[in-house]
Design a protein with these regions (language model features):
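Conserved C-terminal helix/tail region of periplasmic/extracytoplasmic solute-binding proteins
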Residues: 302-331
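Sec-dependent signal peptide recognition
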Residues: 2-9
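Bacterial signal peptide processing site
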Residues: 19-21
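Short, glycine-/small- and polar/acidic-enriched structural segments
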Residues: 28-170, 177-180, 184-188, 207, ...
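Pocket-lining segment of extracytoplasmic ligand-binding domains
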Residues: 93-94, 173-177, 181-266
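Secondary-structure end/capping motifs
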Residues: 232-312
Length: 331
């Protein structure tokens, strides 16, 4: 009987302790605010910092549950401009016609410090600079700004833009089209397509747009947000960007671990691990030369690109000076 009373006493103590612990846990739990965030494309190394921030709990620390999504049929910019999503990833060059028409959207951070896009070509054509592109086949999306970019870098080197043959590029994978001879050169991003070409042992030449026209060192990709969202949720936007910044800073210091985190959230990349790691090693050096200033957009560079668009009448409407970007939400 005495043993039974002792056992009963300890059972009661255990139940009281468990109940107390449960109450404490519920009290300490912070209700997270769910916020949608749209990618521009399939998950890739441009996005690594987002997934690192999610994995490391940086969003949770800010009271945010960031729901990272791929856009379905409508473009990321369209969804954000029309207030169907608050934030997402886009590009300064593609944003130009939207801003010219007065779209209510603002770039709030640059994911990569400098423009890493450029021209890749089959090595057999010995393309060493833009002039060498004469008489070759160009895989194009036939976008006025895109074509003007190629034109200026060719003319800056004494080349004749009219001597290229334009071939419609209907595939996201320009590398395969070059390998198959559909066209001879195309505009790509080094951190994905050039690394992919190297992984496939393709012999190619590459140069950056920015090396042949300083106007073309625009920001790509960028994080954009709906203006009404920013006006009504300024502090929330700062929290999100604070967490994202920490994610990219971690990826800068830990590229291989960051690549593995990306693969965890995008398992379709698992069979391309070596490629993803090499892509990440390249981009981790490109996100920011000073990681404390990750995301910062320089007004001079932003305006220089849009002034070039205005001066060459590439759009019907002009883009106002200093429009479409803000560093106010970065801390």
């Amino acid at each position: 009987m005495k043993k039974f009373k002792v056992l009963l006493f300890f059972m009661i103590l255990f139940l009281v302790a468990c109940n107390s612990k449960e109450k404490t846990t519920k009290t300490n739990q912070v209700e997270l605010k769910k916020v949608d965030f749209l990618l521009d494309w399939v998950p890739n190394t441009n996005h690594t910092g987002l997934f690192v921030a999610k994995e490391k709990g940086y969003f949770s620390e800010e009271g945010i549950d960031l729901d990272i999504k791929q856009p379905a049929n409508e473009s990321t910019s369209g969804l954000i401009i029309n207030n169907k999503a608050p934030m997402g990833i886009y590009f300064q060059d593609y944003l130009a016609p939207k801003l010219a028409k007065g779209a209510e959207v603002t770039a709030v951070a640059a994911i990569i410090e400098n423009n890493t896009s450029g021209i890749i070509s089959n090595k057999k054509f010995n393309v060493e600079n833009p002039k060498d592109l004469e008489n070759l086949k160009y895989g194009t999306w036939d976008i006025p700004i895109e074509l003007a970019m190629l034109k200026i870098i060719m003319e800056n080197q004494g080349g004749d833009f009219s001597k290229i043959q334009k071939i419609p590029n209907t595939d996201d994978n320009s590398i395969t089209n070059i390998a198959n001879g559909l066209f001879d050169f195309a505009g790509i991003y080094y951190g994905w397509d050039k690394i992919m070409a190297d992984e496939l042992k393709m012999e190619t030449n590459f140069f950056y747009y920015k090396d042949y026209a300083e106007e073309l060192n625009f920001y790509s990709p960028i994080i954009i947000a709906n203006n009404n969202y920013l006006k009504e949720n300024a502090e929330e936007a700062k929290k999100i960007l604070r967490a994202i910044k920490k994610g990219y800073q971690y990826a800068i210091d830990n590229p291989e671990e960051a690549a593995n985190i990306l693969i965890k959230y995008a398992p379709e990349l698992k069979n391309k691990k070596d490629f993803v790691v090499n892509s990440q090693k390249y981009l981790s050096k490109e996100y920011a030369s000073n990681k404390e200033k990750w995301g910062y957009i320089e007004a001079e560079r932003w305006n220089k690109f849009y002034n070039w668009i205005n001066d060459n009448d590439l759009l019907k409407e002009k883009i106002p000076e200093n429009s479409g970007f803000s560093n106010d939400y970065l801390e």
